[in-house]
Amino acid sequence: MIRLGKIGFANCDFPYYGIEHNIIPIEKVTIIESHPVNLAKKISNRELDISPISSIMYPKLSNLWILPDISITSNDFTKSVLVCANELGSLEDLSGKTLCIPETTATSATLIRILLLKKGIHCKYMPCKGLEVSDMLKIGDAALLIGDSALHAIMKLNKTKLKVIADLGNEWKNMTGKKMVYALWVVREEYAKKYPEKVEYILKKLLLSKDYGMEHISEIADLIGKKKNIDSEFMREYLHTLNYDFDMESIDSLKQFFKYAKECGLLEKEVNLKFFERGI
């Protein structure tokens, strides 16, 4: 049985839709759903064979190969990686303030640190176990929201005094002119060497499911919206902001992200990307 991880956010429901609804037949696979940080722990502990993980976790873990042609990437605005606050109006207002960071994120937590350091903004970072923005703002001046929590927060903007002071995808785009790669699909190196045909099989199914999703984005957005209690039209807009390919432009952006992380002291060494080669 192949153990396949899945991020428990709407942005991962989309590329898995064809697989999970038996549109893309798949056999001898167990899908294990969790948040990105926990998935990284599971694949590191050999509890998963293949999984999406926060992109920043790739250089922090050993003996992983990247699967080609699939990622979770934004071209600009993300709508699901946000800094929100009640009283503050911009990232510059965070200077000397406290920013709550959910423990379920790694890439976004690194990205906000890079953005603030590059802007010369220094604040206090407060790890938070909960994801409710109201709880986070009781102990901090601003909150980093990711995934479905961010989407739900946007839906409530007109009903509360909560404000989005930054969309990190847009901030990264403004700083670098590049896409932002949030998640990668990886396989344990020893597993790939022992069972290359199984990895090839899963990759093929993932890419077919991803392609099905792109061809049926409106239909799937309606269904995911109902499941997540998010307006269907907004869900369609959200899914259109994301890119699930992993082309050369995305690879270049990922390398830039790792370079900045190292410059900011958030990575210890330079990163060498290793890919699973189809047909090995």
Regions found by a protein language model. Name each.
Residues K193-Y260:
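Secondary-structure end/capping motifs
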Residues I2-H21, S80-D141, D148-H152, D252:
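Bilobed "Venus flytrap"/periplasmic-binding protein-like clamshell domains
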Residues A10-N11, H35-P36, R46-K60, I70, ...:
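Beta->alpha turn/N-cap motifs
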Residues I251, K259-I280:
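Long, low-complexity C-terminal extensions of enzymes
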Residues W65-T73:
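A structural signal for short loop-to-beta-strand junctions that line the ligand-binding cleft
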Residues K129-I220:
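Pocket-lining segment of extracytoplasmic ligand-binding domains
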Residues I23-I32, K119-K129, L266-L273:
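A local structural motif
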Residues I43-S44, D135-L137, A261:
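Hydrophobic residues within well-ordered alpha-helices
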